[in-house]
Amino acid sequence: MFDVSIDTGSVPSNVDILFTDRKGGFSLPPYESFNLATHVGDDLNAVQKNRDQLTSKLPNRPIWLNQVHGHEVFDADDWDGCSIPTADAAVTTRANQVLAIMTADCLPILLTSNCGSVIGAVHAGWRGLASGVIEKTIQAMQSKIITKHTKQTIRAYFGAAIGPKSFEVGEEVRTIFVEHDPQVSKLFIPSQRAGKYMADIYGLARNRLNAMGIHEIDGGQDCTYKNMNFFSYRRDQVTGRMASLIWIKASI
């Protein structure tokens, strides 16, 4: 059920992260089998069984977001326990508050301070990246770090996303990113089709993280489009969603 290439050895001892793939669930084709999304047309009973199976491995049920490819960041310290916030990122300092991001080609990014006092989760498609969802999430985390009067760094973990040899975009997408930072032009390789480019979403995210002073980044080797163990919207159109989750462990 969990098939992402990252080294979890650098995760703070008081933080847990978890990535799902498409295996080991109850959903039938074309959502087979561990689909966690309720908005893609899958049988809701199957989705609930999948969510229940996932929750059994967690300290609490996750905070599912209504993701809209924007840059809003939800402060999960204020979660009421039942609402579905409309946002594309979340942060928290609360133990056992499970942050979750759903994806099927977009890049999920999990973030933690080096001592695990503040965590974040980001849904980073190209629209969210371009509108500053990474920067806004880091700023939200830093505001919580400052209130604790301690110097901390932030590290990032990439879940599975579409790879640079599979993610074709148009000139308009390239222009948006290059106008923001001309150095990222190297992350757009001309495609065989005129006016199209193969984009490196991992590289674009690294660029934004580096600009925010974050250089401890793990993951980025997986391709959802090429690896059939992952859901891929671009490959299959009608398909499920995977989850990337992070939480602070409660003190014993």
Feature locations, PLM:
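Active-site microenvironment for binding and transforming phosphate-containing groups
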Residues: 1-252
